[in-house]
Amino acid sequence: MDNNPNINECIPYNCLSNPEVEVLGGERIETGYTPIDISLSLTQFLLSEFVPGAGFVLGLVDIIWGIFGPSQWDAFLVQIEQLINQRIEEFARNQAISRLEGLSNLYQIYAESFREWEADPTNPALREEMRIQFNDMNSALTTAIPLFAVQNYQVPLLSVYVQAANLHLSVLRDVSVFGQRWGFDAATINSRYNDLTRLIGNYTDYAVRWYNTGLERVWGPDSRDWVRYNQFRRELTLTVLDIVALFSNYDSRRYPIRTVSQLTREIYTNPVLENFDGSFRGMAQRIEQNIRQPHLMDILNSITIYTDVHRGFNYWSGHQITASPVGFSGPEFAFPLFGNAGNAAPPVLVSLTGLGIFRTLSSPLYRRIILGSGPNNQELFVLDGTEFSFASLTTNLPSTIYRQRGTVDSLDVIPPQDNSVPPRAGFSHRLSHVTMLSQAAGAVYTLRAPTFSWQHRSAEFNNIIPSSQITQIPLTKSTNLGSGTSVVKGPGFTGGDILRRTSPGQISTLRVNITAPLSQRYRVRIRYASTTNLQFHTSIDGRPINQGNFSATMSSGSNLQSGSFRTVGFTTPFNFSNGSSVFTLSAHVFNSGNEVYIDRIEFVPAEVTFEAEYDLERAQKAVNELFTSSNQIGLKTDVTDYHIDQVSNLVECLSDEFCLDEKQELSEKVKHAKRLSDERNLLQDPNFRGINRQLDRGWRGSTDITIQGGDDVFKENYVTLLGTFDECYPTYLYQKIDESKLKAYTRYQLRGYIEDSQDLEIYLIRYNAKHETVNVPGTGSLWPLSAQSPIGKCGEPNRCAPHLEWNPDLDCSCRDGEKCAHHSHHFSLDIDVGCTDLNEDLGVWVIFKIKTQDGHARLGNLEFLEEKPLVGEALARVKRAEKKWRDKREKLEWETNIVYKEAKESVDALFVNSQYDQLQADTNIAMIHAADKRVHSIREAYLPELSVIPGVNAAIFEELEGRIFTAFSLYDARNVIKNGDFNNGLSCWNVKGHVDVEEQNNQRSVLVVPEWEAEVSQEVRVCPGRGYILRVTAYKEGYGEGCVTIHEIENNTDELKFSNCVEEEIYPNNTVTCNDYTVNQEEYGGAYTSRNRGYNEAPSVPADYASVYEEKSYTDGRRENPCEFNRGYRDYTPLPVGYVTKELEYFPETDKVWIEIGETEGTFIVDSVELLLMEE
């Protein structure tokens, strides 16, 4: 305590005329129009008129947004500046006020447009105007609100932030309720509703966070600090937290009708003392301990005030309080004596009258008593009188006065909420409790100071439940707590304290009074937070009503935030048996040590239909329609795997808060349906766990196919097929359905879902090829929300966004050769199976293929399933197709035997023996190509639809093709010249001058020597004394000669010359002349030497015999794959007319020779250069 207090001193932040009105820079806020007055009026409005419509919109205009100018907004800023002693910089201040002014002007236009539209709601121009005004208002608020959260000024700007946030939530609620009538589509309305629910949490958490930051900032050790701390707590509860506590009611789908909320939190006026705020050092903690701890709400019945006397001064020395539980549901109880029961005068009884005490006028007494000098001086801090005024909506009630009326008016700091009526009717708070700050320091001073607690008037006494509204009752209004339940401090956004349990058991009992007919039915909802899954039980007057399982909402050890709480409900309605009933809530089925917090319960009239109810009914109907009967034994045939996934999404999107039990039950049914779908699906790995994982099982595909996880279209994996630059190398995906899985004389169906596609070819192959080319428009046209759907909090797709409903009539079903319009993303193809033969294992091939550059596809949920047994015409048709197939199969076997024999003879002739490890000495490249061509004349080596799938003759084809490969390898080993065919450009060749390697139309690479000074050479290692054959295939254009020379360092030179000859030229070792070239070219299909005899006889079977899979009703013409002859290990195209092959024999004397290519003039074109070692 100060040694020399001066009671006449007015300290800078405090004035004795009102110890709680601070002054900053000489400014004072006009009484009746302060931020507290405005906030109390807004809170009253939100509590009483929280129904969407023009009345609400215009109400906000009348209270704030239509009457505020810069000075009023500045008052909000000044209020907190004073409390935290921090002034906002001029730029930030002007920016905030300018934005608020802009929002105010814009909202007035919005409100007027709303009023006009509501008067004529079908007027197209007014509907369009509302869409424009909403978009403008929403954009302005989205831009402005972050400017009220400027770094370092979050606390001073907090009250205007909350005002703007409240306005934003109200506008978003408007579009959620009226958006469809304004002409917005469902996607936009749902997106804005998602914004609404998200921002309710964001704005709430922001406000509470910075309220707590500011509160911590003003705490200090002395009584002066506590005064400011308490003022900050009280005033920002009124201007921030009370408004934030009502944000959750903006959720229009959860609260579609009038909703009554109650604020049970308490605020405190300072201990009524004169010269209190600056006189006591280190007293802040002691004063705060005088504040009542979290507790159940009770009703103040009476205060018995005792009087003591000191040196002739009477004062309030102590008091006794009696109270009743809410609803007056139990016996009156008394609190322990506060202070001491003085007997200097008879006790004064202040009894509850009317609606409670709404005002106190107190007379603090400070005296310094001089008893002598020095330590004999004594100070007295006491209260020597108070008038208690009672609230009434109708008449003035006589007040009760303890000793005398004072001048310290509680209405100065807790003003009425409605200044249009007398304070007794327009009051905002009533007295709820009184504690006593007592302190004595021997002969130095005596302190006795009552501390008044005040509760908002919305916390009514009787827990009344009417029939026409949603009634929210905080559980701190319970009559009794269950053993193990405690009351804990609320998180700041619940409007009061909350209950807590850490073990299973009864939470509390609540006395409620029903004003509606007892036939009225209700549903109960619970707002809770929990670290564990649990089960809630409810009962009325001991009669069990509801029981349900609910999930954890938060992790252990985390702070309570807006997102920690969830409002859950029971779907089963009930009615009360008595007008006054006891409602009991319990929590069970969880492990002790977890935390369960309960904020409030809600009683909802049963006839109120929520969107969650519609969703539940729709989901129940969708789930039941999956099955053939109510016992869920089998799936309906037309229910696709994709549809089951969409029904699963429908179930997953059900509200946990409203119907968790039903949701879990439906989820189990959908999982059962999915398992049934998997069981009937004959495809292996329909969920695309991998491609090419197993050689003989599952999916096989080209390397450019990608598997992607689920998105907003697909719940499971799907595949993406891209286009290709070469139709002979398509993008493909295929799988074979084993014969063992098929039933004889049965129709099967391939179906699935295509998100989008272009040039996607789909095949089903057995006796014939069922084929469709499918072009499906992308998701932007038939699935409009695919690209617009918002994502979840972890980046997952939001499958709860609205989309087009599944309609089986829109399926793209291609049956019996009918063409498909492809207006749907669903597709299906049928194929009929005749007799089955496990030895033959014909099976069914399922193929997806894209062979164009612009082609693409995304598809999933593929199914191959039994459709129905074949009867009548369909049975006859498949038997006819099967017979035709077998007839052609027999013909193919006869033809194949002949072709195979001839091809094998051609291949065998290339080799010395049956080990196929050495070529004949005279085998040349043309002979190998001729044999390879004969091998490729074997039909049905691969499926014409996809040349990577083996056909009936694959085994014999690959046997002979393997030997051709061996022949090419042995031949390459004999040629000592590297890159002699120029397939690798000029690699290994030395070049002088300008030459080119070009790819001609026949896809062969050739060396072009266009200038006489150019030269191409290569050094080659050889074996001295061995014989070699130099063979060159080339073509000469224009005059002059082309020359290929072989030589050693000295002498031993030979050459082959080529010219565009006009007369026969004979070279010493060359066996071909210009005149006989044409004959040889015609005989062998290319330019070969005279040693190529015997390899061009016509085959014994016509080359164009029809495919054995042909079935006229499905495929017209011959199933021939134009890319079939491109298969194998070498592509061979006969040389154009004009090329000549010449050769010579050469015997080197050293281990190195040089091959040189040049010309004299014109152009010399070289196809290949070979230097072959002769056989010994």
Curated annotation (Swiss-Prot):
PANTHER family per record: ENDOTOXIN_N DOMAIN-CONTAINING PROTEIN-RELATED, PESTICIDAL CRYSTAL PROTEIN N-TERMINAL DOMAIN-CONTAINING PROTEIN
Protein's organism: Bacillus thuringiensis subsp. aizawai
GO terms, molecular function: signaling receptor binding; toxin activity
Name by which UniProt lists this protein: Pesticidal crystal protein Cry1Aa
UniProt function note: Promotes colloidosmotic lysis by binding to the midgut epithelial cells of many lepidopteran larvae.
Bridged cysteine pairs (disulfide): none
Extra information: Toxic segment of the protein is located in the N-terminus.
Record carries keyword Cell membrane: no
Superkingdom of the organism of origin: Bacteria
